[in-house]
């Protein structure tokens, strides 16, 4: 018998495979076999037992490396055979380049095995053969799988126009790309001292050209193509795809409200007169296709009030050509602006026991433009105090239905920003706390309140799958929370006063919710 011939016994949890191989050929394969066959008192044995993850695949690889012959003794599907081979190569410390590469461009991994594919990628690091395999196998309903940043960057070659976070400061507007957001990099800044300086120098502005220009609010079109800035000098529109200036609307008034319609064709904005003057009932409409602007007058559009929050609005645009406003009687008026017709008037105050000393704080539309929060304060003095009580009425509003869903009684520090989804309501207040309410079938089934920032929560938002909450504060921190456990997932310093949590879909159907960094808290969202 050949002294170099040994019997290898490969075993896993289900099977045992025995075969003869040349000892020296095995030693030449890798350091793993060299150590195995020259140490541990195995150098003089003729039968070597080896425990492996998959005996069939281990046999195939040994045959391929020692005899230069392809083998698939277990008759596994191509995708499974290839992945198992990669696992074994990693198990014994071999380079994946040693095995025959296969064309994975047309191979699809079943949905039930997709998560194991992602875990293998994260385990092995970058592998060019796995990239097309992941792209081909991803399905839009794989929403519970969290993909690490390095995977996301290799998977998606998406331009900077794909936005996850937009924010503004007194110094300018910041736009963060979703992939670079994960690495905490601001990839483009529209700075007032650069991009904005041309607008400040226009002689047509009806104010001192040296006057500081502030951004009051921002809105991003549903198709993610445009961003509109409501400023103290007028309305500025950027094309986010080309990163170019689209247009500037010059006004004689401060603009505090801006929003897009559902089809991303029109921009609505509210003009405001200077302090001490009554609010204007004029609403401007700018058409992005024609670059033309008109103003419409709305009867009983409420005058601006000193108690209005700085982050809400008393005018908003919902889906299906609906404009919703708060009138001088604190009622919600639902208008089909395409038909120039009032379709519903909702009076929240009729539900209050004492509405003599109440006032609307603001309206807060949901990101899907189907829900509307109407926040009313019952105050004891002319100025809002910590002892004031608030009532939030949440309505479902479309062209056919205008229904009150539920009511939230809120007592405590003044609310600053509210976001609403189909399952959650979150309220950020002026002392750095945020409250979360979960509802089902019109009833609040869970509520909690936690400290999120050292000072005012300037903005708060809910992710599209209701699994995450994003908060921003005057402390300059942007924080991401697990809405189920209320654990902090991640945080970083951004310096923005306002954040907008935007969900988008790339050409591969991957949503941002799949790209959370898990390294900070090591907590995944179930």
Swiss-Prot record:
Residue spans of the WD repeats: 210-248, 452-491
Entry keyword set: Repeat, WD repeat
Pfam families: WD40
Secretion signal, residue range per the UniProt entry: none
Superkingdom classification of source: Viruses
PROSITE patterns linked to this entry: WD_REPEATS_1, WD_REPEATS_2, WD_REPEATS_REGION
Name of protein: Uncharacterized WD repeat-containing protein L344
Origin species: Acanthamoeba polyphaga mimivirus (APMV)
């Amino acid at each position: 018998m050949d002294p170099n011939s040994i019997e290898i016994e490969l075993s896993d949890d289900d099977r045992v495979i025995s075969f003869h191989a040349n000892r020296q050929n095995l030693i030449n394969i890798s350091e793993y076999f060299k150590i195995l066959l020259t140490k541990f008192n195995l150098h003089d044995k003729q039968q070597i037992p080896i425990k492996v993850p998959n005996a069939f695949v281990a046999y195939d690889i040994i045959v391929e490396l020692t005899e230069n012959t392809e083998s698939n003794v277990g008759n596994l599907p191509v995708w499974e055979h290839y992945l198992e081979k990669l696992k074994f190569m990693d198990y014994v410390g071999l380079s994946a380049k040693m095995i025959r590469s296969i064309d994975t461009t047309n191979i699809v991994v079943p949905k039930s095995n997709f998560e194991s594919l992602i875990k293998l990628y994260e385990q092995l690091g970058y592998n060019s053969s796995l990239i097309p395999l992941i792209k081909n196998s991803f399905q839009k309903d794989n929403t519970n799988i969290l993909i690490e940043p390095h995977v996301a960057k290799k998977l998606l070659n998406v331009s900077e126009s794909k936005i996850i976070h937009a924010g503004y400061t007194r110094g300018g507007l910041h736009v963060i790309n979703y992939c670079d957001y994960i690495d905490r990099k601001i990839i483009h800044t529209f700075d007032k001292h650069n991009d904005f300086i041309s607008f400040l120098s226009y002689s047509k502005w009806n104010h001192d050209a040296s006057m500081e220009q502030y951004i009051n609010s921002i809105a991003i079109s549903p198709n993610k193509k445009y961003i509109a800035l409501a400023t103290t000098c007028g309305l500025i529109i950027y094309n986010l795809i080309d990163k170019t200036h689209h247009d500037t609307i010059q006004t004689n008034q401060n603009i505090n409200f801006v929003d897009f319609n559902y089809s991303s064709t029109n921009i609505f904005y509210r003009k405001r007169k200077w302090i001490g003057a009554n609010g204007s009932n004029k609403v401007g409409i700018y058409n992005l296709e024609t670059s033309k602007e008109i103003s419409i007058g709305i009867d009983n559009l409420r005058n601006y009030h000193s108690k209005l929050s700085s982050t809400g609005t008393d005018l908003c645009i919902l889906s299906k050509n609906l404009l919703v406003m708060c009138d001088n009687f604190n009622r919600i008026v639902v208008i089909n602006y395409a038909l120039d017709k009032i379709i519903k008037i909702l009076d929240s105050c009729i539900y209050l026991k004492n509405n003599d000393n109440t006032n609307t704080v603001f309206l807060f539309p949901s990101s899907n433009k189907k829900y509307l929060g109407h926040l009313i304060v019952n105050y004891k003095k002319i100025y809002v105090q910590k002892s004031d009580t608030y009532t939030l009425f949440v309505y479902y509003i479309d062209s056919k239905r205008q229904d009150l869903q539920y009511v939230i009684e809120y007592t405590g520090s003044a609310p600053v920003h509210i976001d609403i989804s189909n399952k959650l309501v979150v309220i950020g207040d002026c002392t750095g706390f945020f409250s979360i309410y979960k509802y089902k079938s019109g009833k609040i089934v869970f509520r909690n309140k936690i400290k999120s920032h050292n000072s005012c929560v300037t903005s708060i938002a809910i992710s599209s799958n209701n699994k995450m909450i994003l908060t921003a504060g005057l402390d300059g921190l942007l924080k991401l929370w697990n809405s189920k456990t209320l654990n902090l997932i991640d945080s970083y310093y951004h310096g923005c006063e306002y954040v907008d949590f935007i969900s988008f879909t790339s050409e591969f159907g991957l949503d941002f919710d799949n790209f959370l960094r898990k390294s900070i808290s090591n907590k995944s969202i179930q």
